[in-house]
A protein has these predicted regions:
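Extracellular glycan-recognition regions
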Residues: 1-179
Length: 179
């Protein structure tokens, strides 16, 4: 999905256009009478990686609108993917959030984090994945561990989303991928 991207040194800035997200809602009714809209239109800049890896990146953004996030995502295809987000929640907090999609998406708020900057990490060993967050880029804490039915080569990269708002800049710094 198209967007504006700027790269300078170890900094990548991606503009998240308005009403962009990766989320596959189910057709079930919920108590509130509405469900998240299914969208797979957020800008996703990725590379393909074979086998085990660890991706780390420092992320930040302005936290203007609900569900704004700077994220990292792994993807087999549009029905099988997962994202690790630093997001403005519907509770008004900044949090480490994860979504795993195997047909339908789930959504799990993790820890609330202070400030507008965090580190995100995704680790792969075989078909097992772990998402971690950090405030200092040194001490990482697990937010989610899961299994995905993926092939040896998957897409791994940066995702910028603004599901409910007008969009904005997402900043990614010190990106590293270890194999």
């Amino acid at each position: 999905n198209e967007s504006e991207i700027m790269m300078e040194g170890d900094k990548i800035e991606i503009f998240a256009p308005a009403k962009t997200d990766f989320f596959c809602g189910s057709t079930d009714q919920c108590e509130e009478g509405f469900l998240p809209e299914s969208l797979c239109n957020a800008p996703y800049y990725y590379t393909e990686i074979e086998g085990d890896f660890v991706l780390k990146v420092k992320v930040s953004h302005g936290f203007k609108d609900t569900y704004d996030s700077a994220s990292v995502m792994i993807m087999k295809d549009l029905n099988c993917w997962a994202k690790c987000c630093f997001e403005l929640t519907d509770f008004g907090t900044h949090a480490a959030v994860s979504v795993v999609t195997k047909g339908d998406s789930d959504d799990a708020n993790g820890c609330n984090l202070e400030g507008n900057t965090a580190w995100l990490q995704v680790c792969r060993v075989g078909n097992n994945f772990a998402f971690h967050y950090s405030l200092d880029g040194v001490n990482f804490y697990m937010m989610r561990y899961f299994h995905m039915p993926v092939m040896p080569v998957i897409k791994v990269g940066l995702l910028a989303q603004a599901p409910t708002g007008t969009g904005g800049k997402r900043v990614y710094e010190n990106l590293s991928i270890e194999r």
